[in-house]
């Protein structure tokens, strides 16, 4: 259907380029974290450095898509694909956190937490099915359903990220403040620009 086509294009457009970068960083992180698995202090340091590096790489492009996704898709693919751009706007912040958290999940292997990884994956699968079903049944609106799916994705990605922070004794509150502050600093001026353009 058209909805599937729009969603597929929006997801691939914003996730594929960053997944290549994330995969490369993830391989390096896995190698280094494996070498440091018995040195929790060094492992904590490299985990923080990697997560912040990923955030700094991803925040601007994903913020631009969040604010200007409909314009970008209309310009690149034509006006018939504005809907895909609107979907991308709803998905972008989730994909940002997916980009950040994916390389860090190598710690499941490094710290030998495969059972926890399995539990997280089961929760992810069932919660996604539930949110799509609820969105379709109660709201019958694709935009609301995609928004809820994206919010769920952000929550799940952050839950896994903070799970590792807790294991490595990284201050979770400080990192929440760091993320919220920097996302606001980047996105707010872009929204002002959009308002001026309208």
Residue ranges and their predicted role:
Residues 11-14, 23-26, 62-63, 67, ...:
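Short runs within selected transmembrane alpha-helices of multi-pass transporters and secretion channels
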Residues 60-79, 198:
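Short membrane-interface helical motifs at transmembrane helix boundaries
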Residues 1-15, 80-86:
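Interfacial/gating helices of multi-pass transporter permease domains
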Residues 52-60, 93, 185-189:
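Hydrophobic alpha-helical transmembrane segments of multipass membrane transporters and ion channels
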Residues 40-68, 85-88, 180:
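Interfacial transmembrane-helix starts/ends
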Residues 10, 14-51, 105-110:
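Helix-loop junctions and terminal segments of transmembrane helices
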Residues 192-198:
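Juxtamembrane boundary at the C-terminal end of a transmembrane helix
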Residues 40-41, 45, 111-113, 165-176:
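Membrane-interface helix-boundary motifs at transmembrane edges
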């Amino acid at each position: 259907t058209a909805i599937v086509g729009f969603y597929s294009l929006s997801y691939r457009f914003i996730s594929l380029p960053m997944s290549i970068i994330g995969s490369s960083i993830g391989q390096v992180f896995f190698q280094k974290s494996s070498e440091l698995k018995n040195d929790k202090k060094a492992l904590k340091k490299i985990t923080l450095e990697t997560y912040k590096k990923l955030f700094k790489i991803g925040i601007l492009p994903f913020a631009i898509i969040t604010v200007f996704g409909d314009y970008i898709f209309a310009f690149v693919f034509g006006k018939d694909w504005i809907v895909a751009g609107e979907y991308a706007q709803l998905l972008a912040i989730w994909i940002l956190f997916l980009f950040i958290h994916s390389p860090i999940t190598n710690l499941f292997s490094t710290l030998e937490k495969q059972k926890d990884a399995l539990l997280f994956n089961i929760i992810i699968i069932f919660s996604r099915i539930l949110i799509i079903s609820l969105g379709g049944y109660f709201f019958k609106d694709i935009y609301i359903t995609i928004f809820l799916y994206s919010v769920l994705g952000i929550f799940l990605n952050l839950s896994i990220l903070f799970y590792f922070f807790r294991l490595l004794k990284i201050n979770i509150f400080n990192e929440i403040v760091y993320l919220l502050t920097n996302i606001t600093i980047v996105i707010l001026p872009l929204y002002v620009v959009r308002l001026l353009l309208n």
